[in-house]
Amino acid sequence: MNHRITTSVIAFTFGALTSLAATAQDASQLGKSLTPLGAEKAANSAGTIPAWDGAVPAKPAGFKPGILYPDPFAGDKPLFTVTAADVEKYKDNLTPGQVAMFKKFPDYKLNVYPTHRSAVFPKGYYDETLANPGKAKLSPGGNGVIGTTGGLPFPIPANGLEAIWNQLTRYRGETYRTDNVQVAVTRTGDYTPVRFQNELDFQFASLNKKPAERIDNLLFYFVQRIVAPARLAGQVLLVHEPLDQTKVPRSAWTYNPGQRRVRQAPNVAYDNPGTAADGLRTNDDFGLYNGATDRYDFTLVGKKEIFVPYNSYKLSSGVNLTDLIKPGHINQDFARYELHRVWVVDAKLKKGTSHLYARRTFYLDEDSWAALLIDKYDGRGELYRTAEQHSITLYDVPMFFGTVELHYDLQSGRYLALSVRSGDDKMYEPAKLTAADFAPASLREAGVR
């Protein structure tokens, strides 16, 4: 049976999109009719999306800083559940990828809860954002950001590239450690957990560093080490991610314990296979999208109200893999969806370039600029994969933080789940690390920790 989904089978209705002219308001409205990051403060006309008030969710009992974040909205009940039987009723608020999941898996469902616009960030981040209009610019060619080292560069984006650079540079914390598990799931639901320990140091938008202390043209440092299974344990990946990739491309190195050698890894980019992902994601799928923007033309289509993963506290910590991982898709009783306004950005592969995905459609949360959903198409125009980013607000930071990341292959019926956490896995543990900890010479030591 042919399970390929074509764009002609599932037509995404853009009729409900807000026109760009109506949303490109003057920067003077930031913090007034617009939130500090450029979202509409007001509720929607139906009252199904509330106004944004900037309040930080309360800390429930049982909170363990950096590890366990209990659900501040645990008392909420689903408003309704979207199933394959009634998907047509709700299709105006669904993406093509979501509709395809219902067609592929008849037992798939979305539990839709009351909307909480809980994405909030530190005041210092808002303050730097307010200074960016007229100062922050795209670098020549659009493959980087210049004129600023902090805040959200383009709270009122003029085009698709500016919107994508908001997604790439959004505030994701400071310097921290995190533990997580990745599983590449077969069609029958089998998997071998791969356990990672990661360290990150964000330079752009860091509030622990004054602008003059932020390393020039560096977005972040990233170290990823595998601790299990035994056949992969000790492998380490190091990435130095530049801000303006027209100046300096991404630098990456790997350490293989069997060879006991550190090697440069120029292929850790674009559509080369992701670490231990069994071919189910590309390197630039990590975090739903990362890296250079030079292979696509990005179009800012407008805004749309979509059921997106949001406030996914039940899914984000203390999860048992055997309860969560099922054939075809995760156990959707762990997932929470809410109606939110998202920016729709359509990316089409430039002529003369190549990529596994000929087209990507991004759905960026208006309150955080995180990509919450992405639909990916192959060279024949067929819907190939769809991905979703579940997120929570870390109410002690505060910030909107991506947790479980899912990549569904609609053609093979397989999927990849990343950043699954159980027990006392660290979610966000602040760390004191220096540039030396992210130097290639440190990789051998990292592999034996």
Regions flagged by a language model, labelled:
Residues 1-10:
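Bacterial N-terminal signal peptides that target proteins for export
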Residues 12-14:
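Aromatic (phenylalanine/tyrosine) cluster motif
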Residues 16-22:
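N-terminal signal peptide c-region/cleavage motif recognized by signal peptidases
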Residues 27-55, 82, 95, 223-293, ...:
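Gly/Pro-enriched, hydrophobic low-complexity segments
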Residues 27-249, 256:
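Solvent-exposed N-terminal domain segments of exported/luminal and surface proteins
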Residues 179-228, 286-362, 372:
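Extended beta-strand-rich segments in extracellular/periplasmic secretory proteins, especially
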Residues 425-449:
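Long, C-terminal catalytic modules of enzymes
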